[in-house]
Amino acid sequence: MEQILKFFWYSSTIILIFTILIHNPKSEGLGSVGAQNQFFSNTRSTENTLNKITWLFLVLFLLLTTIIAVS
């Protein structure tokens, strides 16, 4: 049972790291001068979906961490 939990824990860790890394930065800074405006509805819905996936895997990671630590 512990092997299965650790497999899901490692998988959720990798997916969580990946989803965090593919997020767009919130601040635009000087690098956006002259850049195109990216406030299309498609971009917003993709960002919202990515946020939900990130939170889901964060909760899963923390839950599995707690379960593995207790057992």
Curated annotation (Swiss-Prot):
Keyword check for Transmembrane: yes
Membrane topology term: Multi-pass membrane protein
Molecular function per GO: protein-transporting ATPase activity
Keyword Hydrolase: no
Transmembrane segments: 4-24, 50-70
Predominant place of localization: plastid
Keywords, comma-separated and alphabetical: Chloroplast, Membrane, Plastid, Protein transport, Thylakoid, Translocation, Transmembrane, Transmembrane helix, Transport
Subcellular location: Plastid, Chloroplast thylakoid membrane
GO biological-process terms attached to the record: protein secretion
Top-level taxon: Eukaryota
InterPro entries (UniProt xref): SecG
Signal sequence annotation: none
GO cellular component: chloroplast thylakoid membrane
NCBIfam families: secG (TIGR00810)
Function as written in the Swiss-Prot or TrEMBL entry: Involved in protein export. Participates in an early event of protein translocation across the chloroplast thylakoid membrane (Potential).
Sequence similarity: Belongs to the SecG family.
Descriptive protein name: Probable protein-export membrane protein secG
Organism of provenance: Pyropia yezoensis (Susabi-nori)
